[in-house]
């Protein structure tokens, strides 16, 4: 019979630590959140603004497209502008097709980037493939930069895939085309990493990723990579999609892999709504890591879903207000109140689970449900502290939350 301990997360897979502009990826370091801009990198103002927004939202690494001379020329200026804003956020250059040429022609760009991302499926073709791949690796060695070898199934090395398909067709028990494609993705990453090491790039300068669009494929290829190498791994779907579908797909895929100890950095590739907020993908990535217990970024607000006992919307509005206040104040609170991200707040709507859930939180309130006495007990550190009554229960509880934060986490600052 299984014990409760059997269902805890598996120990983190041992991977080699890679320093990306001062942010450690792998080697047991906290799982890193990263994101990518969707601006024209040559538009310096727009790119600086979006990188800054992503970084403020919590993105620890930000990737930018470097697709032509104008983009490459803009990179050192973007880096300089960000530093003037007090943002020493590592920038990752996303290269396809002509990365070797852009890095050679723009040495200031090569120096300003914290990492190069290359795709072995389009770094070059036929006779030029290994040569152009080697040129990028040599630039990484020259400037002492790490490289992410990022394989995408949408741009998979067709020569490798064809060879594996031919071998499979001749096998006694052939695999499905989907299974062969998974194998090709994994082999592309591993063969490219081996070639990079042969050229002279140290293993602690290599991160691998294998990106696909389907949840089961992401689970499979990353599990295979984890078994066959100790390189740091970057997790993410190639394109998760829009809205709730993208969030659910990302959480399902990465949640399973992370639970098995696999993954050193994640990116949630949400398709934003037209004129939508790009920082949403950062928030979702943080929430995946936080709800699974791997990292803490912001205080947790637990609230019941509501039922026939909670016809009032007061508890919903209160939970939303507290969540909004937390998001708004976190940039200041993070500096002013170290450890505040570990706070747990409960806002419950009736007597059934309200008191119990509130006791489990650092501070919680059990609001009256339909037909219940119009009083709301407040629990602090597991004990009933007081009961709120009257028309200002919500405002009074919000004030109590702020007071609790100041007293509990402000004392740490004073002690330090």
Swiss-Prot record:
UniProt entry keywords in alphabetical sequence: 4Fe-4S, Iron, Iron-sulfur, Isoprene biosynthesis, Metal-binding, Oxidoreductase
Residue spans crossing the bilayer: none
The protein's required cofactors: [4Fe-4S] cluster
Record carries keyword Signal: no
Biological process according to GO: isopentenyl diphosphate biosynthetic process, methylerythritol 4-phosphate pathway; terpenoid biosynthetic process
Pathway in which this enzyme or protein is active: Isoprenoid biosynthesis; isopentenyl diphosphate biosynthesis via DXP pathway; isopentenyl diphosphate from 1-deoxy-D-xylulose 5-phosphate: step 5/6
Enzyme class: oxidoreductase
Keyword Transmembrane helix: no
Cofactor-binding details, from the entry: Binds 1 [4Fe-4S] cluster.
Residues that hold [4Fe-4S] cluster according to the record: 304, 307, 350, 357
Gene Ontology terms for molecular function: 4 iron, 4 sulfur cluster binding; 4-hydroxy-3-methylbut-2-en-1-yl diphosphate synthase activity (ferredoxin); 4-hydroxy-3-methylbut-2-enyl-diphosphate synthase activity (flavodoxin); iron ion binding
Gene3D superfamilies: Dihydropteroate synthase-like (3.20.20.20), Sulfite Reductase Hemoprotein, domain 1 (3.30.413.10)
Enzyme Commission designation: 1.17.7.3
Catalytic activity: (2E)-4-hydroxy-3-methylbut-2-enyl diphosphate + oxidized [flavodoxin] + H2O + 2 H(+) = 2-C-methyl-D-erythritol 2,4-cyclic diphosphate + reduced [flavodoxin]
Family: Belongs to the IspG family.
PANTHER family recorded: 4-HYDROXY-3-METHYLBUT-2-EN-1-YL DIPHOSPHATE SYNTHASE, 4-HYDROXY-3-METHYLBUT-2-EN-1-YL DIPHOSPHATE SYNTHASE (FERREDOXIN), CHLOROPLASTIC
Functional summary from the UniProt entry: Converts 2C-methyl-D-erythritol 2,4-cyclodiphosphate (ME-2,4cPP) into 1-hydroxy-2-methyl-2-(E)-butenyl 4-diphosphate.
Stated name of the protein: 4-hydroxy-3-methylbut-2-en-1-yl diphosphate synthase (flavodoxin)
């Amino acid at each position: 019979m299984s014990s409760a301990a059997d269902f805890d997360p598996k120990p983190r897979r041992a991977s080699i630590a890679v320093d990306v502009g001062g942010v450690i990826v792998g080697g047991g370091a906290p799982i890193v959140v990263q994101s990518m801009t969707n601006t024209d990198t040559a538009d310096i103002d727009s790119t600086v603004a979006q990188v800054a927004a992503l970084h403020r939202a919590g993105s620890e690494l930000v990737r930018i497209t470097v697709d032509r001379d104008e983009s490459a020329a803009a990179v050192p200026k973007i880096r300089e502008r960000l530093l003037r804003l007090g943002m020493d956020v590592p920038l990752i250059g996303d290269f396809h097709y002509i990365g070797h040429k852009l890095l050679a022609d723009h040495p200031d760009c090569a120096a300003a980037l914290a990492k190069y991302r290359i795709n072995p499926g389009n770094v070059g073709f036929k006779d030029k493939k290994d040569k152009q791949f080697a040129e990028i690796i040599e630039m990484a060695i020259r400037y002492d930069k790490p490289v992410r070898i990022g394989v995408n199934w949408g741009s998979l090395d067709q020569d490798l895939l064809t060879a594996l398909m031919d071998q499979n067709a001749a096998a006694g028990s052939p695999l499905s085309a989907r299974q062969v494609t998974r194998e090709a993705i994994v082999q592309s990453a591993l063969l490219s990493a081996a070639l990079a090491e042969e050229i002279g790039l140290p293993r602690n300068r290599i991160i691998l990723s294998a990106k696909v669009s389907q949840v089961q494929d992401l689970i499979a290829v990353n599990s295979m990579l984890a078994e066959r190498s100790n390189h740091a791994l970057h997790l993410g779907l190639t394109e998760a999609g829009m809205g709730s579908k993208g969030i659910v797909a990302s959480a399902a895929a990465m949640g399973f892999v992370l639970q098995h100890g696999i993954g050193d950095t994640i990116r949630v590739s949400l398709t934003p709504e037209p004129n939508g907020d790009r920082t949403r993908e950062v928030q979702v990535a943080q929430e995946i890591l936080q709800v699974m217990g791997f990292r803490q970024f912001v205080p947790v607000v637990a609230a019941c879903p509501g039922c026939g006992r909670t016809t009032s919307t007061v508890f919903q509005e209160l939970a939303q207000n507290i969540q909004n206040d937390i998001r708004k104040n976190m940039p200041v609170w993070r500096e002013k109140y170290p450890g505040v991200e570990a706070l747990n707040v409960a806002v419950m709507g009736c007597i059934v689970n309200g008191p119990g859930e509130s006791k489990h939180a650092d501070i919680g309130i059990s609001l009256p449900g339909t037909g219940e006495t119009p009083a709301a007990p407040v629990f602090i550190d597991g004990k009933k502290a007081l009961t709120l009554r009257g028309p200002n229960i919500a405002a009074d509880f919000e004030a109590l939350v702020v007071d609790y934060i100041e007293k509990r986490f402000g004392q740490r600052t004073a002690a330090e």
